Every structure is written in C-alpha cells, then in structure tokens.
Amino acid sequence: MKSVAQTVIAAESFYTIAAKTGSVIQAVETKEGGDIRLGKYEHKPEQEWAFVREGDGVYRIRNRANGKLIDLMMTGTANGTWLHLWEDVGGTSQMWTVEPTPAGTVRLRSHWAGGKCIDTVGMGTAEGAILQIWQETPGDDQLWTIAEVKDRAKRAAKTEEPKAGAVKAEPAKAAEPAAAPVAAVEEKPAEKAAEK
C-alpha cells in the first residue's frame, strides 16, 4: 500500500474528486446537513474541495462554496452511513485518509469509521448517486481521481487585451485544462506549491 505522502495535495489548492465516469463529488445543498452526491462537473465551487491536513495522512475535506466539511451523518460508522455537509466541529467523523491505489486513483477512508471507504449507494457512479461509507470492495465506486482545479480568474487575466496606450504583452500560451489529475503522490509545502 502506498502512503498518502505520495499524493500531491497542496495546502492552498482546490480539487475535484471524480468517479471513474467523470462525475464529481458535489455539495447539492450547501446548508448544514446538505446532501453530497455525484454530478457533472460545471466549474462550480460546490464541486471543488480543499484537503486540510490534520496530521500524518489525515485530512478534512472542505467545500469551496461554503467552507463546510464532508462528514458522516450522525457520526455513524456502519456500512451505508450517508455523507453530508457539516460545519467544522473538530470531530474525527470529519477526518479522511487518502490512500493511493496502483491504478493511479485513490480511496478516501474514514478515520472515524475504521477505514471504511467513501462509496456510492447501490454502487452507482452516475450523476445523482448518493455518497456513503462502506467496507472496502473491489468495485469502481470506491475509486476516485483527485484533480487540482486551475484558477480560472488567473488564466482569464493572462489572456485579456491590454487597455489603450498600454504596452502589449507576449501572447498568452494555450490555456491549461480546468483540472489536471494528481499523478505524483507526495506532500509538498505551500512554499513549493507557490513556486510552480
């Protein structure tokens, strides 16, 4: 088993978490206790997540839209416990371990529920699938691709036309894709992340 130290998760970045089908984990409702399901990626903050490091390989997964965390409903530990959004209460039901797989995907394991994996109800991977935890199975519904979200505002600023009288800069290079899969798997300090 590879350690989380092999997954690049930058402290100041946001990520999509995608199923094999390309559907991403999203906050359907951004209120306290709101649903978390799979959906088509539309560059919305409800679909983007920060991994907040809590310790050796342990993270809180924070939603970009509202700052709420992926949490276990009623702090459940049983197979089939649904995930929902909740404010940061410092509880271990909001802590997750990122475990790389040989295929380049990851399993997201509950630190609270004995390592059960984020999974979809009924093994669904299509849009609308509800998220839960379940003991490890060989199915694709527990395998996730974490991809960094490129800051669209910075990319747009590079391609804007200069104002009249301003010196025109070199043409912008082709825009990068909205999300690039995380391939290397190691922690990098925020300072090194800022250099790139």
Task: Name each model feature, range by range.
Residues 1-176, 180-196:
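Lectin-like carbohydrate-binding module/patch detector with strong preference for beta-trefoil
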